[in-house]
């Protein structure tokens, strides 16, 4: 039962998104900032591994709200992440799948993009992004 609930919450990781992250990481710093909890994070890591990816391959650093004891969309979580990474919000492209978080990122100074959560639309969107990433 728990496994089924976790599967519903995590969904399937979009392979096109993972491919884009690998390409982007060749040219840019890539960070993950997530409100995920420990159980769902472990499930996501397991799914990444099953697809042949590791967090070290995809991200320079991972920031998880449960470990930081802060949560998006609070400004404190963005402040801590930028302080630890040295990121300049004005030159940082920030993707989020929740409108309130994308808007909070924009108010913080990020170039903020709201990504689609419909699996078909998201797949198509990331396919297009992949075409436009120069390697």
Locations of the language-model features?
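Asp-based, Mg2+/Mn2+-dependent phosphohydrolase catalytic module
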Residues: 37-38, 43-135
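Substrate-recognition element of Asp-dependent hydrolases with the DxDx(T/V) motif
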Residues: 1-49
